[in-house]
Amino acid sequence: TLAFYSNAELDMLHIPAEDEARKAIRILNPISENLSIMRTLLTPSMLNVIVDNLKKGNAEGRLFEMAPVYLAKELPINEHPHERQTLCIGAFGPEEDFFTVKGALEALAAGFGLSFD
């Protein structure tokens, strides 16, 4: 997904004003207001992909994205932001629930020799 979104997407997720995710770097010349800040979370993008899939008639799916998020050390920025690799997993459909995502995380962790015990 794109590395940009808008403050409106953070508003829809009810991200508090004092949350680190609100310390987004504003793009000086954005393509549109919908792509005006650098992402601090992957959640808005994941939700948009799920909505797009549902609109296209896909009744179920399991998705993941591993991509950087950009965290400003301070605003306005005076140095390069911290880029943190982040994993986001989403699932939708009548058979999907918390345990679907939990199982995906456990399988991924096991692949790296990790556990949640």
Regions picked out by a protein language model, each given a short descriptive name:
Residues 1-117:
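Extended beta-strand-rich architecture
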